[in-house]
C-alpha cells in the first residue's frame, strides 16, 4: 500500500512538472506595450524587425500596430507571428489569417489569428466562424480599430440623468 501511494505521488509530481514546463518563447518575456506574457499568448505573439536592425516582441497584431505608430518613419524588414496551432513563428505576410469568429481576440475587439497552412485556417473558420484574410487586411483592420479607440478617448458618455434643475 505504501508503494502505491509513493507511486501515485511521484506520478502526480511528474505530471505537474510536465504541465509547468511550458516552452518559453523568444525574448522578450512580456509585450513591451501592454505587459502581457508572450509565452501565454504564444499563439498570437509577433516579432516586428525594422531595417535598422531593431526589433520588438509583442503579444499580438494590436501591439504591433501600436509599435509601428510609435516607430513611425522606421522601415519594417519583417513581421513574424505565432501559428495559432503550433505557436511556432511564421512569416506573417505569407500566413493565412482569420478575422472574426467566436474566439475572443487578444487586445482587439475583433479576433485575428494566423495559420501556417490553409487546411488549418479553413478548419478554424468551419468550427469558429470568421473569414480568411491577408496580412495587409488584418493590419489595416487593426489600425482602424486603434484609430477608432483613440477617437473615443476622453469621451466617457455617462448620460445626462444626474443633472439637477
Feature map (PLM): residue ranges:
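N-terminal export/membrane-targeting signals
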Residues: 1-20
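Intrinsically disordered, low-complexity terminal tails/loops enriched in metal-binding residues
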Residues: 18-165
Amino acid at each position: 500500500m505504501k508503494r502505491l501511494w509513493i507511486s501515485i505521488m511521484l506520478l502526480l509530481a511528474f505530471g505537474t512538472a510536465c504541465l509547468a514546463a511550458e516552452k518559453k518563447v523568444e525574448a522578450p518575456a512580456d509585450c513591451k506595450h501592454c505587459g502581457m506574457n508572450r509565452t501565454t499568448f504564444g499563439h498570437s505573439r509577433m516579432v516586428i524587425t525594422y531595417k535598422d536592425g531593431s526589433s520588438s516582441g509583442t503579444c499580438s497584431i494590436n501591439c504591433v500596430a501600436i509599435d509601428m505608430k510609435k516607430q513611425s518613419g522606421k522601415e519594417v524588414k519583417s513581421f513574424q507571428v505565432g501559428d495559432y496551432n503550433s505557436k511556432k513563428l511564421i512569416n506573417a505576410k505569407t500566413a493565412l489569417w482569420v478575422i472574426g469568429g467566436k474566439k475572443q481576440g487578444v487586445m482587439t475587439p475583433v479576433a485575428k489569428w494566423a495559420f501556417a497552412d490553409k487546411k488549418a485556417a479553413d478548419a478554424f473558420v468551419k468550427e469558429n466562424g470568421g473569414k480568411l484574410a491577408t496580412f495587409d487586411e488584418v493590419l489595416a483592420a487593426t489600425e482602424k480599430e486603434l484609430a477608432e479607440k483613440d477617437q473615443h478617448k476622453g469621451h466617457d458618455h455617462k448620460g445626462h440623468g444626474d443633472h439637477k434643475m
